[in-house]
Amino acid sequence: MVGRVQPDRKQLPLVLLRLLCLLPTGLPVRSVDFNRGTDNITVRQGDTAILRCVVEDKNSKVAWLNRSGIIFAGHDKWSLDPRVELEKRHALEYSLRIQKVDVYDEGSYTCSVQTQHEPKTSQVYLIVQVPPKISNISSDVTVNEGSNVTLVCMANGRPEPVITWRHLTPLGREFEGEEEYLEILGITREQSGKYECKAANEVSSADVKQVKVTVNYPPTITESKSNEATTGRQASLKCEASAVPAPDFEWYRDDTRINSANGLEIKSTEGQSSLTVTNVTEEHYGNYTCVAANKLGVTNASLVLFRPGSVRGINGSISLAVPLWLLAASLFCLLSKC
């Protein structure tokens, strides 16, 4: 705030006498030119504000005041603020320059002129605009599918910033309004990803920040591929599953868990697994089960390794015919990393 300096007590009588001459004692008129009311000057935070005041003749006695007190009386500076100075581009100008304007400078300023005829005042109201700035936003969050999620984005600025939320996907929905909170009820896996908060006003470019929302859900088999193979050749069965966290895989032949050994090799990466028979024999033909599990659930698919030309009893479609005890045992084993 543009403040004022307290005069030395020894000089107080002289100061008071000078102010009596400088400042009007009667009712003020509207402005120096008699035709305008209070002028509004709009300046962005950090810029320089120039509050114009032009007198009628060189003999006029002028002072600048604001709600805090006297800023300038004639050419004597009363304010302690180093950002404030007079601007006189010609003899009749008595403008006030405020550098690096901040929000606390906002308010009414008065140029008071004492002429030979009557006192006059010109008022200027300084409006300080502030670019939008996000001050608080939710941290990245992980929730289970079906949960309710509330994201928070708070911003400062003048005028008040408009908050806009957007889901950053190709078909991402945009949530517009001045709401600081974005509520997602019963969140689904499709609603996972990054959410962008944009705070905007007319002062400058928008401030943008992001929140990542991770949605956990149980495994779903997305593809299971049976295969045919002749004896003596290599063959693979493949299984893919979607889940968050990524699923762990196990393979079974009948009710027996399969390990990578004796010509069988299991390879699993995030979201997919394959069982490879390096040298197919008659005993390898038949039904196999791919089990995918994470901490939220377990699912399975049945696949077949069959002889060329034979009728496919199972074509690789998802099946739930596996005994419940096997699914329960698989889930327990996967979660305990047995």
Swiss-Prot record:
Top-rank taxon: Eukaryota
Gene Ontology BP annotations: cell adhesion; locomotory exploration behavior
Keyword list, A-Z: Cell adhesion, Cell membrane, Disulfide bond, Glycoprotein, GPI-anchor, Immunoglobulin domain, Lipoprotein, Membrane, Phosphoprotein, Repeat, Signal
Tissue distribution: Expressed mostly by neurons comprising limbic-associated cortical and subcortical regions that function in cognition, emotion, memory, and learning.
Signal peptide range in chain numbering: 1-28
GO CC field: postsynaptic membrane; presynaptic membrane; side of membrane
Residue stretches making up the Ig-like C2-type domain: 29-122, 132-214, 219-304
Matching Gene3D superfamilies: Immunoglobulins (2.60.40.10)
SS bond partners: C53-C111, C153-C197, C239-C290
Phosphotyrosine modified-residue sites: Y94
Propeptide intervals in chain numbering: 316-338
Subcellular location: Cell membrane
Glycosylation sites: N40, N66, N136, N148, N279, N287, N300, N315
PANTHER family xref list: IGLON FAMILY OF IMMUNOGLOBULIN SUPERFAMILY-RELATED, LIMBIC SYSTEM-ASSOCIATED MEMBRANE PROTEIN
Similarity-based family: Belongs to the immunoglobulin superfamily. IgLON family.
Record function comment: Mediates selective neuronal growth and axon targeting. Contributes to the guidance of developing axons and remodeling of mature circuits in the limbic system. Essential for normal growth of the hippocampal mossy fiber projection.
Protein name per Swiss-Prot or TrEMBL: Limbic system-associated membrane protein
Annotated organism of origin: Rattus norvegicus (Rat)
Top-level taxonomy: Eukaryota, Metazoa, Chordata, Craniata, Vertebrata
